[in-house]
Amino acid sequence: AGALVLIWRVHKLPVTRNASVKVVLLTAACMLPVYIGINWVNRSATMPLPVVQNNALQTVDFAVFTDKPIVLNVWATWCPPCRREMPVLEQAQQNYPNLHFIFLNQGESAAEVNDFLNSQGLKLENVLLDTSGAVSEAFGVAVLPTTLFYSPQGKLLYRHVGGVSTASLDYALQQLTQSTPEE
C-alpha cells in the first residue's frame, strides 16, 4: 500500500523538474516488495551443511557449528565493504563467545586469505574457503558481503546484504541471542 501511495505522489510531480526524482522513487517503490519477498522466503530456509576447507587447508563440516547460533559472513579480500566490516565482525566474535562466527571467503586461495588477514592484523576464527562459489550458491548468496544469522537448528533468522556497521550488527546479534535461549 505504501508503494502505491508513493507511486501516486510521484506521478503528480512535474516531469521536467523532477524526472530523476521520479526514477529513483519508482525504482525504490518497485524494489521494496522484491526485497521483502526475498526476506520472507528466506526465513523458511534451513542452513545447508557442506564440507569445506579452512584457511589452514583442514576439512571442516558445517555440522560442527550446530550447537550454537551462527553468524555466517560471506566475503572476499577484493571487496571494499567486506574489508571495512572485518574489524567490526572480529570485535563481535570476541564479544559474543556464545555464537559461532563463520567467515566464508569467496573464490580465493588460503594463501591470499591468510596474507590479507595477517596484513590487517585480524584474528578471526572459523575462516572457511569457498573456492568454487558452490557453497555460497547453496546459501543463496549472490552479493558480497552478505551476513546470515541462523538458529542452532539451522533456521535462517535474518539476512543482511552489504557491509555491517557496529550498530546494525549489534541489533542483529541482540535479535539472534533473544530468539535462541541459552541451554
Locations of regions flagged by a protein language model:
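Hydrophobic beta-strand anchors of alpha/beta hydrolase catalytic cores
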Residues: 71-72, 101, 147
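Active-site acidic short loop of glycosyltransferases
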Residues: 66-68, 98, 122-124, 141
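Short pre-active-site segment immediately N-terminal to redox-active cysteine/selenocysteine motifs
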Residues: 68-70, 75-78, 143
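A short beta-strand-turn-helix
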Residues: 49-70
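Solvent-exposed coil/turn segments that connect beta secondary-structure elements
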Residues: 55, 77, 106-109, 130-132, ...
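N-terminal targeting signals for export/organelle localization
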Residues: 1-51
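Structural microenvironment flanking redox-active thiols in thiol-disulfide oxidoreductases
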Residues: 83-120, 131-137
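Thiol/disulfide oxidoreductase modules built on the thioredoxin-like
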Residues: 116-123, 130-181
